[in-house]
Amino acid sequence: DIVNFRNVTASGTATAFSLPCMFSHLPRARFNIDDSYQSENLLDVMQKAGYDVLWMDNDGGSKGVARRVPYIDLMKEGNPEFRNGDTFFDEVLLDGLEDRLKNISKDTVLVLHMMGSHGPSYYKRYPDAFRKFAPTCDSAEIQNFPTEEIVNTYDNTILYTDHVVSGAIDILKKFPQYEAGLLFVSDH
């Protein structure tokens, strides 16, 4: 079953702020980035409660959220098949996921930190097979391109993100023995 939470807003416009806020016990109005480093976050609490926790990162770091839990930096350790210049396509997060799930022996939380639709280099966020909306803006200098091309390029990132999330759901469906769930949240 898929549930769409409609009344959800990001807590900030940059990953460096919004990600720690999302995992904090504090509401946005009381959240302070400096204080967040002095307190436990949701992952810390889950780990202390006995869950295995693993952060798999394809977006340049957890911004301190995963500093006390096991962490895999896929931008350094990712399968070269998914390499795109100096980054990786988000499908790298699915590579090996099925094998990880086969080896789960207790309650587990896996965080798949995606690159998603980060701009302004939207054109670098999806493989050519997902270039469905055209013409596209194939540059980080988006101010030099028509709005239609920027929107098309962004829409291609959404199409690809949907593909990756769908892939994760398909992998989870292979494990009916688990009471599994997938929560997709954009940090900004």
Predicted regions and their residues:
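Metal-dependent active-site segment of extracytoplasmic phospho-/sulfohydrolases and closely related
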Residues: 157-188
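Active-site-proximal segments of metal-dependent phosphoesterases and phosphodiesterases across multiple
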Residues: 130, 147-164
